[in-house]
């Protein structure tokens, strides 16, 4: 199933709903959230969960839902644990009245486990900016949508950025580019891409895995201090990001040569290091900040009514 067909089916289904919703107005569109507010990844999971819930609440308050049919947001805490994530999916997929219309796993590990289930259950998976990169091939994975970008495209973009700073792709030859990565399916996603580009452009590549949850990185950064890579990339998440940035500062690694994936670029990641994080870079697949019309509507229709899940001053974090 491609996205156009999915959209058409969804619209057709919603247009048919008022006949069921009239009178008691009981029919709701089930859009679940696989949240992780607890554990080592909670500092990043909490604002994601708050923002997602606030957006769905805004649609209900501003528009009466979708085409007048309210959204039912069912949450389940995964703790960013793959096993718990699969259990959450099984628990919520048949939630009445509509069943889950879409699932966002918010974890590459959980996404990998849910992909085989998607075509059987006919529940679309949105893994936007994460998950299995090869799932972008809709002919092979018709129920998975990982737009607007993938980890392979992010790795390519970061190498291109480095090349631009160094004077072109030819200037990469002989440079050292290291990757500090979360030792999981998520962190391993860019390895093949970076290895292939190293072979093509002649830079020396080395991957340095960091085990869950990422608090022990002394040896990693001592190795970086010793071997002096020209650039360090990071595929981190949660507390791993905070520790890495502090460790980089402690060995005085140049922050403007330290670049994180888009999941390593929040305020939560840099605040513990304070001014020492100045210059640190990260990728992104969207514009930052909370000054867009959707954010204004969240303030008006959600927080002004006391319905917000987080702090008003952290909208758009």
Model regions and ranges:
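Bacterial N-terminal signal peptides that target proteins for export
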Residues: 1-10
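C-terminal segment of classical bacterial N-terminal signal peptides
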Residues: 16-24
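Beta-alpha junction/loop-to-helix N-cap segments that form part of ligand/metal-binding clefts
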Residues: 30, 43-50, 62-138, 147, ...
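Extracytoplasmic "Venus flytrap"
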Residues: 31-53, 76-83, 107, 180-189, ...
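Signal peptide-proximal N-terminal region
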Residues: 50-73, 166-170, 199-202
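Extracellular/periplasmic Venus flytrap/periplasmic-binding protein
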Residues: 84, 94, 133-134, 142-251, ...
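Periplasmic-binding protein-like
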Residues: 93-106, 126-128, 176-180, 228-238, ...
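Extracellular/periplasmic periplasmic-binding protein-like sensory domains
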Residues: 248-317
